[in-house]
Each structure stands twice: as structure tokens, then as C-alpha cells.
Amino acid sequence: VLDVILNEYPSLEDERDEEGRTCLSFAASIGFYEGVCNLLDRSTKNVYVCDEDGSFPIHTAAENGHIKIVKEILKRCPHSKHMLNKLGQNVLHIAAKIGKQNLVKSLMRRDDTKHLGVGQDVDGNTPLHLAVLNWRYRSIGTLASDVKILKLRNDNGLTARGIAESMVKPNYIFNE
């Protein structure tokens, strides 16, 4: 159906919805893999077009945990891994912040994306910092396995461990 519509009205590919999203970004947000592939077959230009909120389709897919779509975008547009949203966050920042552990694990295992773990956003936070700030303990374990990431400090001078220590109240009781 998408093919028929876009063949008849090719300009729809570049139209934006009321939230400022392109067709590709919308398809990525809802996990419509076949639609994403169809749109990428036609053109990859919208991979590099941000929404009104400053995020790109790869960020939208990551935020919603659509690993297959993130991988497809990376396969067809390898440089998209370097794209930053308006907060200076890459795709791994987004996955860590939201707690999409399977995506975090996938990105940290790939030789071409594991370096994203040392990326710092506009506040100097790495994906690990964001995972700690948002209590995404599963992602923390994966990200903390890289010693380089553990040593990085954000703009407040805090490591991820420092953030965790500052967030724990003295009367917390931990159970296993």
C-alpha cells in the first residue's frame, strides 16, 4: 500500500506531520520495518533530516526500542551513528537514557558503534551517566564494562559512579 501511495504522490515522502516528523521518522517511531526499508530503498536523504524536536529517525527508532530499524539505518547509512540530537546525544545516549538494554548491548558489541559510549552530550554526560541518572541498571552493567567510559566526567565534574553515590540516600536498604 505504501508503495502505491508513494508512486502516485512521491512528494509525500518529504511531507511532515503535525509533530514535524517525516514519513521515515514516523515509520521508525512505530516500528514499521517494511515501511522504513521501502522509504530507504527510495532515498536515504531523510535519514539526515531532523524532526522539530531535534531528533533524527535513528534516535526515534532507538527511543522506542526498534533494534531492527536502528540496524537497518546503520547498515544503509553508516555515518548516521554520528548524528546528534539537539542535546548533543547519539543513538547510544538515547538507548541508555530510555533503558533499551537490548539496543545498548547490541551497539556496545559492534566494533563500528561501541566508541559511541565515550560520547558526551551538551552537559558532558556519556550514555553511562544518563543510564545512572535514569536508574537504568541493566544498561549500566553493559556500559560500565568499558574502563574508558567509567573514568569520564560530566560538566559538573562527576563520573557516573559519583552521580550514583550522590543519588543514594543514607537510609537506603538494598536487597538481593
Model-derived regions: residue spans:
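Solenoidal tandem-repeat scaffolds enriched in leucines and small polar residues
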Residues: 1-50, 54-55
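Conserved hydrophobic residue in the first alpha-helix
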Residues: 24, 58, 92, 128, ...
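Conserved ankyrin/ankyrin-like repeat signature
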Residues: 1, 34-35, 68-69, 102-103, ...
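Ankyrin-repeat boundary/linker signal
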Residues: 15-16, 49-50, 83-84, 119-120, ...
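Ankyrin repeat domain, specifically the short helix-to-loop turn at the C-terminus of the second helix
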Residues: 4-11, 38-45, 72-80, 108-115, ...
